[in-house]
UniProtKB/Swiss-Prot annotation:
This is Aspartate carbamoyltransferase catalytic subunit. It comes from Leptospira biflexa serovar Patoc (strain Patoc 1 / ATCC 23582 / Paris). It catalyses: carbamoyl phosphate + L-aspartate = N-carbamoyl-L-aspartate + phosphate + H(+). Catalyzes the condensation of carbamoyl phosphate and aspartate to form carbamoyl aspartate and inorganic phosphate, the committed step in the de novo pyrimidine nucleotide biosynthesis pathway. Heterododecamer (2C3:3R2) of six catalytic PyrB chains organized as two trimers (C3), and six regulatory PyrI chains organized as three dimers (R2). NCBIfam families: asp_carb_tr (TIGR00670), PRK00856.1 (NF002032). One of its GO terms (biological process) is 'de novo' pyrimidine nucleobase biosynthetic process. Transmembrane segments: none annotated. Carbamoyl phosphate binds at residues 58-59, 108, 136, 139, 268-269.
Amino acid sequence: MYAYSHKNILDTLQFSKDDLNYLITKTNRMNALHESGKAFGILHGKLLASLFFEASTRTRMSFEAAMERLGGRLISTVGFQFSSISKGETLYDTMKMIEAYCDIAVIRHPVEGSSRIAAGAVNIPVINAGDGAGQHPTQALLDLYTIVSEKGKIDGLNIAFIGDLKYGRTIHSLINLLRHYPVHLYLISPEELRLPEKYKKNLEGFPMTWEETTDIKAIWDADVAYVTRIQEERFPDHREYEKLKDIYKVNKELVLASKKDTTILHPLPRVNELSTDVDDLPNAAYFRQAKYGVVVRMALLCLSLGVNFD
């Protein structure tokens, strides 16, 4: 009998295909409970620490909404300047204090690997909400759930990733999940922002196939197009960012030249890479994608806390 065993959610490499299929099933169940008004109270008496040491709108509010909709409560800190870390306190010590207050912690931090440090300090569950240019596992899980919800399947899809494949942690994370499925990827980026080799190595021995290109017209063959912004805050040289920031733009004309049902995704926020004239197309799914994020995180909070919701 299958048993899900992930208390902490730190990295997409921790998930097997069985885990992913189980999470999709459990999220469907959570969505049904939520829509029927029966999810509220499942986490009554539980307290979430929402620790965001790097800017966030969607992820922070999504987790906080998820906890509130389950009947739990939360305490939060936003930015280094509003925490004792600004006084020199280590992340380890901060987490030891959080453990005394809360049942579960969600953390976003600009340093890659920080979530592992946080999880290593405490016995409560820790969920990585983004660590620098590294991983963003819950975004990847909601992206996978969005693809299933919008397309009805994963197997056999052609999926295009467009933009910053070097620094885009949402791409790094989602590719690690998609490797378990027989899909084909178009990795569309300028040469300077190719997918790093360490992520390509993770794909070896899996049923996924992929190809790299600089040509945005590869989107025409895609069933799903995942657009990302160029990550300005990750560039060591701002001149390089200025050179690349507007290299791709997905607009209505490009989408209409693609397959009729190409699903357009974006983790948001967007800058110039995705035109607002796409918003009114029925296959523009990025706002639905954000909505799916709440029920996915509702399911993950319950599973990490070991709370049953069958």
